[in-house]
Amino acid sequence: MFPMVTEFMNYGQQTVRAARYIGQGFMITLSHANRLPVTIQYPYEKLITSERFRGRIHFEFDKCIACEVCVRVCPIDLPVVDWKLETDIRKKRLLNYSIDFGICIFCGNCVEYCPTNCLSMTEEYELSTYDRHELNYNQIALGRVPMSIIDDYTIRTILNLPEIKT
C-alpha cells in the first residue's frame, strides 16, 4: 500500500490507544472521588487504635517479682531492674524499675514473656517531648494508667476500619 496511508492508519491507531489510556486514568480518578477522606485533623480528631496496638508500656509494681525475664528477652537489654535480696524471706525485693522510651523499639517481648503479667501495652502513643531525658520512665511514671481517647470529650474519635473490597 501507499506509505502515506499506512502512516495515517498508524497515527489513527496511536490516537485511539492514547485516548483509551487517558480514559482509563480518568475512570480510576473518578472511582477515588467517592471515597472518604484519609486525612484526619490530628489534635482534634484521633484514630482509635487497634486491639493489638503496641503503645507505651504499663507497669504494675506490686505484681513484679524482679525475675529479670524482661531484661533477658529484650533485644536491646533496655529495662533497668534494681532489686535487693531479702535474706530473712529469701526473696528478691524490687527497688526500682525503669524503661527509656527513647531507646525502646516497642517489640513487646517483655510483655509477652513476663510470668506475672505485670507489664502490658497501652494505647498511648503520644510520647514526644522536647528533652530526651523525659522519655526515661521510672516505676511511678510507668504505673500511670493513660486516659482513654474515647473518654475525652474534646477529641472526636474515628474508627479505623479496614476497607472491604467488593
UniProtKB/Swiss-Prot annotation:
Annotated binding of [4Fe-4S] cluster 1, by residue: 64, 67, 70, 114
Localization terms from the record: Plastid, Chloroplast thylakoid membrane
Lineage: Eukaryota, Viridiplantae, Streptophyta, Embryophyta, Tracheophyta
Entry GO CC: chloroplast thylakoid membrane
Annotated GO biological process: photosynthesis, light reaction
Residues annotated as binding [4Fe-4S] cluster 2: 74, 104, 107, 110
PANTHER family, per the entry: NAD(P)H-QUINONE OXIDOREDUCTASE SUBUNIT I, CHLOROPLASTIC
Signal peptide span: none
Function: NDH shuttles electrons from NAD(P)H:plastoquinone, via FMN and iron-sulfur (Fe-S) centers, to quinones in the photosynthetic chain and possibly in a chloroplast respiratory chain. The immediate electron acceptor for the enzyme in this species is believed to be plastoquinone. Couples the redox reaction to proton translocation, and thus conserves the redox energy in a proton gradient.
A molecular-function term among this protein's GO annotations: quinone binding
Segments forming domain 4Fe-4S ferredoxin-type: 55-84, 95-124
Keyword hit for Nucleotide-binding: no
InterPro entries noted in UniProt: 4Fe4S_Fe-S-bd (IPR017896), 4Fe4S_Fe_S_CS (IPR017900), NADH_quinone_OxRdtase_chainI (IPR010226), NDHI (IPR004497)
EC number per UniProt: 7.1.1.-
Catalyzed chemical reaction(s): a plastoquinone + NADH + (n+1) H(+)(in) = a plastoquinol + NAD(+) + n H(+)(out); a plastoquinone + NADPH + (n+1) H(+)(in) = a plastoquinol + NADP(+) + n H(+)(out)
Protein name, per record: NAD(P)H-quinone oxidoreductase subunit I, chloroplastic
Cited Gene3D superfamilies: 3.30.70.3270
